[in-house]
């Protein structure tokens, strides 16, 4: 089956933000999605953005993904990227009960910054390949997602990956349901523009 050519212009851009505690596997998920490799260790002090043309449900789009740092010292940057994000993946590790308990903090902060009662988000239960270390059950995750009225998905970035592409694609689908695509084309360019050649750009925190 032939692959359709990538349109060169007039593509909608979706700014997706990956949030969650440090060490839950946000970078591993993002790198697996963009580069199709599993990186078990990653510098926790770096925030990266990635740019990718992708086809979802026969519609091409540009995904501009910000992989955020989970450490508290970067908390001052959170409101900035939350203001410009079109959708959010709230990630926790099923092996880390504290990261699950902190989901509420991220959820409430997003709604407060957006000044909305609801916003495109997906609750992501990561590291499900580590079944012997699992501390948060599927039912607990689903219950929390139902409480927030957002989708729930279980993932693993480790090869072979589980639901990695689906997670990012599903978030775009949620955004499309709420925001007409024609309006997406009129949006201003992202503030965390990635390098088109490498698909990644290191962000720096400036303290005023």
From Swiss-Prot:
Family annotation (Gene3D superfamilies): P-loop containing nucleotide triphosphate hydrolases (3.40.50.300)
What InterPro entries does UniProt report for this protein, alphabetically?
P-loop_NTPase, Small_GTP-bd, Small_GTPase, Small_GTPase_Ras-type
The record describes how the cofactor is bound as: Binds 1 magnesium ion per subunit.
Task: Name the residues where the record annotates lipidation as S-geranylgeranyl cysteine.
Answer: 205
Q: Which Pfam families match?
A: Ras (PF00071)
User: What cellular component GO annotations does this protein have?
Assistant: plasma membrane; protein phosphatase type 1 complex
* Superkingdom of the source species: Eukaryota
What sections of the sequence does the record tag as coiled-coil? none
Q: How does it sit in the membrane?
A: Lipid-anchor
User: Which biological process annotations from GO are given for this protein?
Assistant: cellular response to leukemia inhibitory factor; Ras protein signal transduction
Reaction(s) catalysed (UniProt annotation): GTP + H2O = GDP + phosphate + H(+)
Quaternary structure note: Component of the SHOC2-MRAS-PP1c (SMP) holophosphatase complex consisting of SHOC2, GTP-bound M-Ras/MRAS and the catalytic subunit of protein phosphatase 1 (either PPP1CA, PPP1CB or PPP1CC). Interacts (active GTP-bound form) with both SHOC2 and PP1c (all isoforms) to form a tertiary complex; SHOC2 and PP1c preferably bind M-Ras/MRAS, but they also bind K-Ras/KRAS, N-Ras/NRAS and H-Ras/HRAS. Interacts with RGL3. Interacts (active GTP-bound form preferentially) with RGS14.
Its biological function?
A: Signal transducer in the Ras-MAPK signaling pathway that regulates cell proliferation and survival. Core component of the SHOC2-MRAS-PP1c (SMP) holophosphatase complex that regulates the MAPK pathway activation. The formation of the SMP complex only occurs when MRAS is GTP-bound. MRAS has low intrinsic GTPase activity and may require additional factors for activation. The SMP complex specifically dephosphorylates the inhibitory phosphorylation at 'Ser-259' of RAF1 kinase, 'Ser-365' of BRAF kinase and 'Ser-214' of ARAF kinase, stimulating their kinase activities.
What protein family is recorded? Belongs to the small GTPase superfamily. Ras family.
Q: What is this protein called?
A: Ras-related protein M-Ras
Q: Which species is this record about?
A: Mus musculus (Mouse)
Q: What is the lineage of its organism?
A: Eukaryota, Metazoa, Chordata, Craniata, Vertebrata
């Amino acid at each position: 089956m032939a692959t359709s050519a990538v349109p060169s212009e007039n593509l909608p851009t979706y700014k997706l933000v990956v949030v969650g505690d440090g060490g839950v596997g946000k970078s591993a998920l993002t790198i697996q999605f963009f580069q199709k490799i599993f990186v078990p260790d990653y510098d926790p002090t770096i925030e990266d953005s990635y740019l990718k043309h992708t086809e979802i449900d026969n519609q091409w789009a540009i995904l501009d993904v910000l992989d955020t740092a989970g450490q508290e010292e970067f908390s001052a940057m959170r409101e900035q990227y939350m203001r410009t994000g079109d959708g959010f993946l709230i990630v926790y590790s099923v092996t880390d009960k504290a990261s699950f308990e902190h989901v509420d903090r991220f959820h409430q902060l997003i709604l407060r910054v957006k000044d909305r009662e609801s916003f495109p988000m997906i609750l992501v239960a990561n590291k499900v390949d580590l079944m012997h270390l699992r501390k948060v059950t599927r039912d607990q995750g689903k219950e929390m997602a139902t409480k927030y009225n957002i989708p729930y998905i279980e993932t693993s970035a480790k090869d072979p990956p589980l639901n990695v592409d689906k997670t990012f694609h599903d978030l775009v689908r949620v955004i499309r349901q709420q925001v007409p695509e024609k309006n997406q084309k009129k949006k201003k360019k992202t503030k965390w523009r990635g390098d088109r050649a490498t698909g990644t750009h290191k962000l720096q925190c400036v303290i005023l």
